[in-house]
Amino acid sequence: MLDILLFVHITISILLIIVILMQRSGSGGISGISGDNNMGVVSAKTVGNFLSKSTIILTTLFLINAIILANLSSKKKSNLVSKINEIEENQTDNSLPIAK
């Protein structure tokens, strides 16, 4: 479960970087690479709205996934600590001298 969520987190991160870089900035951003200012059927405002909404959705998914990953990893760590403590208690109770 943790591995799947980690893969999803990395994928969301990469998509978020791509969407942010595609947004139009003062210098044009990566969206101006084509050099064609006439976008045909799709207007620049429509593309800007789509990229803005995509950024908001991906950011929300990123934050939710980060919280879930943090919660799961803290539970996993506490389980590991309790198991180590149990093993140490069992070893001290059942320890016998090696040689007499």
Swiss-Prot record:
GO terms for molecular function: protein-transporting ATPase activity. Its main location: membrane. It comes from the Bacteria. GO terms for cellular component: plasma membrane. It is found in: Cell membrane. It is a multi-pass membrane protein. InterPro entries: SecG (IPR004692). Keywords: Cell membrane, Membrane, Protein transport, Translocation, Transmembrane, Transmembrane helix, Transport. The chain crosses the membrane at residues 1-21, 54-74. One of its GO terms (biological process) is intracellular protein transmembrane transport. Involved in protein export. Participates in an early event of protein translocation. NCBIfam families: secG (TIGR00810). Belongs to the SecG family. This is Protein-export membrane protein SecG. It comes from Rickettsia typhi (strain ATCC VR-144 / Wilmington).
